[in-house]
Amino acid sequence: RLPRIAGPCVLVIFGVTGVVNFAQGSIVGFGAMLGWWFIGVCGWPWWLALLAVAASSALIGWIINLTTVRPLIKAPPIAALLTTFAASMVLDNLSQILFKADTREYPAPLPTDDLPVGGVRLGTSDAVALGFTIAAMLALWAWLRFGRDGLAVRATAADPDAARQMGIPVTRVQNLSFLLASCLGGVGGIFFGMYAGVISPYSASFTGTVGFIAAAVGGLGSIVGAVAGGFVIGLLEALGIYQFGGSFRDLFIFGAFLLVLLLRPHGLFGSRHTVTSEPMTGTFLGAGRPPRLAWWHWVLLALVAGLAVPLLGGPVLSSVGTQVAIYAIIAVPMTLLAGSTGQVSLGQAAPVAIGAYASALLVMRLNLPFLVALLLAGVIAAVLATLVTLPIWRLDGHYVSMATLALGYIVLSVIRGWDAVTKGAYGLSGIPAPEILGLRLLVAEDHYQLDLVVLAVTLFVVFRIRSSHLGNVLAAVGSDEIASRSLGLRPRGYKALAYALAAFFAGMAGALLAHQYNYLDPTVFTVQMSVLVLTIVVLGGINSPFGAVLGSLALVGLPEALRLAPDVRILLYGIVVIAIIRFLPQGLWTRRA
């Protein structure tokens, strides 16, 4: 049901602005919580709550457009994509602060009678939701086809510049698209709450991603395709849960998405012209160059980080330092992918998870030495992540970034469902501590020193690559893909290579995490980890490896040292991303060229 509503909502905004609105699912979730408040706490009738939620959600959508999309309308769409991702984080955690994180029963304002329809029995809320979906989609189709404002929306979606020259108020049309999509999303949240029976602030946030997948499967640019894609995704989800259980739900949803990308990138009902080129991050987020440090700067930094922190800070500061170092190891090679080649990965938690479980299993099951398992973890993560994503590098547009996000969900689904190997949701426990040359590293100070050595190696390798011929080729691919192709280069192959390098170091970081915390479960490797890594890279400057270290220190070290609550921490991450992309897109450790 929700994919059928969310798909057209995402489609309307994507068509008009060229932006994948990741905040759409959060608007659905916020609408569900508002509906719970109005009906369950305030005692309003359901129809009045429906109107109030529709108006409130429309207002939220207008604010999101005003603060995160409209100011970046002339920037590459990847910038607005990241800010809507950040807006989703802000809205989810604001909802958690306002309504608390508890799961609660959703009020049932409609009768619970079963209605026989063609041999299928539907509850009253099911029938109302189905009727609303059909009516809303028909009304949306008619409005877009025959309405004056609907025609303006279609004209703006086809060519904003031409629409502006014809006198169409493009800014007002973009506002209207956000108001409409957010209104439908909020109302869909109420029906989601009625259907689910129990909700929490995070219950429906996933629907924004599923909505884009439904629209992409059906075909971007086609209302019929978006609805059909929603039905296909909903059917696959139901069949997957019925046959294999809920653990494999995401595998079917995102597996179908990847399959459609490979076989028919423009979707079941879409046309090829809707698959647009990926904007180059180097012209916006990557503007400027990072400052160069003298050799004595590096010596001083090594002394402070390697000696002062463990000696003066003790185990507490060393524990914080291990987390900073691990996230920095993941983020530093991302500067090759996002900074040099101009490709953003939204699922970097996937190779981290692969490396963590691979290293833990190699040591626990095969009794391999830790250092061997550490290197093999990076190799396994790079090979598996690259093999799964290799075909997608021939695609363009938002699809590549979304495919990396899909990989993250697929890996998590496999981990949850492969009980015989990964122990599923129970996780792996008793993972041995790192052991090097017979010396077992048990205390935080030792872990920190080990992580610092791996981080130093990572920085050395990435700096060497950036200053080499390979680094120049990667930068050329990111600067102008068409020109690099005309010179005989293979841009997609080099993008895949940059992704493999980032996955290798991410796998090693996962191995360090596994052996230092002695326990793994799927909740460690959520999309929030991927977003945090991307935030670190953007904050430091996507062309600056050392900036990634500073970003990790700011976004991981400071919140840990200040002991901020998780919801406040993620709220802070979202605000930082929006502020950096809007006001300092080149990052902190970058000077203007």
Where are these regions (language model features)?
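Membrane-interfacial amphipathic/re-entrant helices at transmembrane-helix boundaries
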Residues: 1-6, 34, 41-49, 75-81, ...
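Single transmembrane alpha-helix segments in multi-pass membrane proteins
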Residues: 1-41, 63-79, 171-172, 176, ...
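Cytosolic-side transmembrane-helix boundaries in multi-pass membrane proteins
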Residues: 9, 98, 102, 158-165, ...
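Transmembrane alpha-helical segments in multi-pass inner-membrane proteins
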Residues: 43-55, 175-263, 349, 374-375, ...
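Alpha-helical transmembrane segments within multi-pass membrane transporters and channels
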Residues: 43-87, 94, 228-233, 237, ...
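Mid-bilayer segments of alpha-helical transmembrane spans in multi-pass integral membrane proteins
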Residues: 58-63, 84-102, 126-127, 134, ...
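Extracellular/periplasmic helix-loop junction at the C-terminal end of a transmembrane helix
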Residues: 82, 89-118, 242-249, 265-278, ...
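Helix-loop-helix "hairpin" substructures at the membrane interface of multi-pass membrane proteins
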Residues: 121-199, 223-228, 290-294, 442-521
